[in-house]
Amino acid sequence: MSDTSTVKSQCEDQNIDLIRLLYVTPSGVIQANTVDVSEVDAAVESGVTLSEVIQVYDAFACRNRNSRFDAVGEVHLCPDPETFRPLPYADRAGAMLCNIRTLDGEPWDVDSRSSLQSVERDLRAKGLSPQVAFESEFSLFSRDGDGKINRGDEAGAYRTESIRGTHDAILHIVDALKAQGIDVKKYHPEFSPGKHEIVTGHHTGLEAADEHLLLRETVKSVAEQDGYQATFLPKPFDDGTNGCHINVSLWNGENQFFDPNHGDISETARQFIAGVLDHAPAVLALTAPTVNSYSRLQPRHGAAGYICWGWLNREALIRVPAPAQGREADSTRIEFRGADNTANPYLGLIGLLAAGNDGIERELEPPEPVSVDPCDLTDAQRTAKGIKRLPQTLGEALDALETNEVLREALGPDLFDAYVEVKRNHWKLFTESAGAWQRERLRNLY
């Protein structure tokens, strides 16, 4: 859809009265304003007024009183009509994803969606177009009358028993995603009670990030209608974790990550990997942006505990998956395993793409791939292979981000500073409160 007449026609056909204008702040929490369908022309043409200060609220709706933004200052929330979707889980409602613009109509420097668009434009000018897909993990649970949590099945990953136990809820989620035009590729239960994973198709970075936000909204909304609560929190319980693996390749008519002469990943892919590894501690501040994230990024958690890469290695930060047989040229990609669903997906992709592009521009060579669980190596062996530990707290990751000029330039100084402010406030709240209290609140937010 490219104009408001198409949006209004679809709203009339499907009896839609309310349109949610969705956006996500540096906190990673999805926000919305809602307009009546009669206001859609005005919303697209002129935007909807939004306070600047919303961008520096953290996940708990708190902000630093010495913030760069305060009660004075407004911007415009500008819906993109091409992103319009009816919401099958919300009666007479639709949604559009939004950019944020200044009162003069220019892209606001603190808007993450506009910033990702700029990064992708710069890459396309160099002949590289990203293709991205998210693998989203989440947990379904319910509460009894006393508030006690019931996590459902105990069967484990890939078991048909687990599939049977939540079949109706998952089917309703998949139906709702497909009704919004989201390309669902795979689903399976995962390695802890009530944990599930949905994989969606490859798109441009912007389209993939947009769909990821719609998926998060859909899963939580449909699960609630089926009597569950869904959480994407990285470590919602004492056991089990939820990640968000990000699959990336770069294209220029053909897949630039595939070397047809050797049937292997290309030099471009290796340079991209090297760049991500080089900037990994700082990138993590964008892709694993909550205190809870670092409870997941531990050795032997099937996530990543160390900065390394490897073929088929699920304990490496970057895994090179096996390509589809007979479709190697189309399916060769890398999988970044250090992300989770508390991230603002636009910012996470900016970090990954900027780091990888820096590796290409500097023609970096990655270290040798790691073919074992890095936990099985001795300290001396890891040192010899150049394998370092990932940041173990959000504070450490933010320290790395604040000194990283490549990511500062990619985000732009205003967005960079606003993001650091929000996450420093989040880190400060954690250091002043109990971890169990944090997890309980974050489990509901994400």
Swiss-Prot record:
The keyword Transmembrane helix does not apply. GO terms for molecular function: ATP binding; glutamine synthetase activity; metal ion binding. Induction: Expression is induced in complex medium (CM) in which putrescine is both nitrogen (N) and carbon (C) source, in defined media (DM) with putrescine as the N source and glucose as the C source, DM with ammonium or nitrate as the N source and glucose as the C source, and in nitrogen starvation media (NS) without the N source and glucose as the C source (at protein level). Not expressed in CM in which yeast extract is both the N and the C source (at protein level). Mg(2+) 1 binds at residues 135, 245, 335. Residues 112-446 form the GS catalytic domain. It comes from the Archaea. Disruption phenotype: No glutamate-putrescine ligase activity in complex medium (CM) in which putrescine is both nitrogen (N) and carbon (C) source, in defined media (DM) with putrescine as the N source and glucose as the C source nor in DM with nitrate as the N source and glucose as the C source. Pfam families: Gln-synt_C, Gln-synt_N_2. ATP binds at residues 249, 314, 319. The keyword Transmembrane does not apply. It catalyses: putrescine + L-glutamate + ATP = gamma-L-glutamylputrescine + ADP + phosphate + H(+). Belongs to the glutamine synthetase family. Dodecamer. This is Gamma-glutamylputrescine synthetase. It comes from Haloferax mediterranei (strain ATCC 33500 / DSM 1411 / JCM 8866 / NBRC 14739 / NCIMB 2177 / R-4).
